[in-house]
Amino acid sequence: MTSKVEIVGDDSSNQITQTPTLQMNEWHYFTSAVYTIQKPEFLKDVNKISREFVNRIKKTNKLDEIYPVYMSENMFTDPRMSEFTNFVGYLARDILIRQGYNLTNLDVAFSEMWTQEHYKFSGQEEHMHPNNQISGFYFLDVPKNSPKVIIHDPRPAKVFSNLPETNMSQATYASTMINFTPEPGTLMLTNSWLPHSFTKNPNEKPFRFIHFNLGIVSKQQVNTQAGPGAQATIV
């Protein structure tokens, strides 16, 4: 016996009567937040320091033809970066508190901060930063038609069962990724569990930004922390 698939509600011979939209309570939970703020006042000084760090790498490393990007050493311990790192640390702590986390006995600490300088065709695949709480970017040199920052849906079950989108150019509940166009002087922060990527740089000019990650340490750990040379900076 041949089985027949019945399409419910697809009988075009019947006149379709539209019913009024039901008014339902709508609750939103488990959201993924992206935070941005314009801070052009940091551009001049941070840009100068960033170039110094990248130039050190250029002296010892040639630009890779397959992955044409320079990545600097850690920058957060440079005392000239203190005003910037203090501000970023304040934002990171404020974000976590506003999200409902209890940081009474905890402090925010930098684990990484480095410059990325992407040349033509360089980009980054989707990834995230484990063992951290807040990740972010400060955009420095942004050429015309710059790469996009892509934020990906972190829910594998939702991505697995996702239906086709009506309009992929619009940000809706059906979207699996959202893109942002960087601007010089923009700070962007997200939770570190939120995956991100960058589209390839189509320009002859490099696309440059500072990337940073912050984790959490206990206040007791802060009090017993080693002196100079420690790999975490409390902010």
Identify the function of each model-found stretch.
Residues Q38-K39, E117-Y119, D153, S192:
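Pocket-edge structural micro-motifs
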Residues R56-T60, E73-T85, P130-S135, I150-F160, ...:
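Short N-terminal helix-initiation segments at or just after the protein's N-terminus
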Residues Y119-L187, Q220-Q225:
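Catalytic core of non-heme Fe(II) oxygenases with the double-stranded beta-helix
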Residues Q38-P40, F139-D141, N213-V217:
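Solvent-exposed residues in well-ordered beta-strands and their adjoining turns
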Residues T31-A33, S111, N132-I134, P206-R208:
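Residues at beta-strand starts and edge strands
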Residues Q170-V235:
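Catalytic core of Fe(II)/2-oxoglutarate
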Residues T2-N102, G227-T233:
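Non-heme Fe(II)/2-oxoglutarate
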Residues N86-S146:
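Conserved double-stranded beta-helix
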